[in-house]
Amino acid sequence: LGQAILRRHVEAFSHNGLPEDSDDARRYLAEHDDALAFARSNRALIARRILQQLKAEGEPRLDVAHNFVEPCTVAGEAGWLHRKGATPDGQGLVIIPGSRGDYSWLVKPVVSEASLFSLAHGAGRKWMRTECKDRLSAKFTPRQLCRTGMGSRVICRDRQLIYEEAPQAYKSIDSVVDCLADAGLITPVACLRPVLTLKTSGEKSA
């Protein structure tokens, strides 16, 4: 959905900006907000289905987007802040996830204008997606990658994706969290160990 919105916008306006009070800008922002609402509902549906399979009950505690644009004032200047793979620091506790073979961290953000009111949204990649299978296929079969060194399980029917998202392709989450803590941007609260990871491209199968 987001890609379709972007494609239509670029086809119409190239990469030029739009006056924020124009009809075109308002139309784009309305589509942007609709995409965020769709993503929110999709996450809720996934969570509900997981709870149903576990025959458990639960309620949402965290729901944080990390690809969106919003009005923001920095150093007294009003403008628009685009987060592309960044977590807002003003919504309370957030999770900074590691790879499927590493811990994730629950952290308390420290609101900071210097960091554009944003935090890292995960460990970050070491390798490009296109090189992961070449690096790993001689060492691991897809079946072997369905178990991690931490004992957690991975459900993924896409043979390309399971290599692209392998733990080896990501940085250590501890190094990222330590950097944020040393910079005074977060207070670590809890360390979370993965139990089950579901990965899907939504269109491919084994």
Predicted regions: what they are:
Residues L1-A206:
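Domain-length cofactor-binding catalytic modules of enzymes
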